[in-house]
């Protein structure tokens, strides 16, 4: 979106910009992956206690993740997270002379934010469409079963391909 945007002058090749943006996104994903691994580790250590109290592991996972998120530098609120990533991308591209602009930083950041938001909404919409399709199946599929997972993943991949996301 930055390449086609009228308010931004591109000073390096599109593929090099994409590569740098991918690094920023991967770093953010890696931080959350590390957080998830730590939370899983903590819950694994407490497995007997969790079973004894008949606690919901998913709920404990999210509670623990929320508590540790700041320590790992992970922002859990999507809007705040996308805004932070957009700032990181903008700062990097400007500092390394990938782009130039004469408008406000916020205008360019908003282009980046909207692009991230639209991209992520494509995945959410694909997920919703898959759930709707599965609901219409004559044979009722139970979430969590092998049949459900196979059909869900096949339909989800088809939706992502249809939207050009993979």
Model-derived regions, located:
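Short, residue-level hotspots on alpha-helical faces of the histone-fold
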Residues: 37, 41, 45, 62, ...
């Amino acid at each position: 979106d930055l390449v086609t945007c009228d308010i931004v002058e591109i000073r390096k090749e599109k593929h090099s910009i994409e590569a740098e943006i991918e690094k920023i996104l991967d770093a953010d994903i890696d931080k959350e992956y590390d957080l998830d691994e730590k939370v899983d580790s903590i819950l694994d250590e407490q497995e007997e206690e969790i079973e004894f109290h008949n606690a919901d592991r998913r709920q404990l996972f999210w509670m623990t993740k929320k508590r540790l998120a700041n320590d790992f530098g992970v922002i859990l609120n999507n809007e705040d997270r996308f805004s932070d990533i957009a700032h990181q991308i903008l700062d990097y591209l400007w500092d390394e002379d990938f782009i130039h602009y004469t408008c406000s930083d916020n205008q360019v950041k908003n282009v980046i934010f909207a692009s991230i938001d639209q991209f992520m909404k494509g995945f959410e919409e694909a997920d919703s469409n898959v759930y709707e399709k599965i609901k219409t199946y004559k044979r009722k599929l139970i979430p969590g079963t092998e049949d459900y997972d196979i059909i869900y993943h096949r339909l989800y991949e088809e939706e992502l391909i249809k939207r050009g996301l993979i």
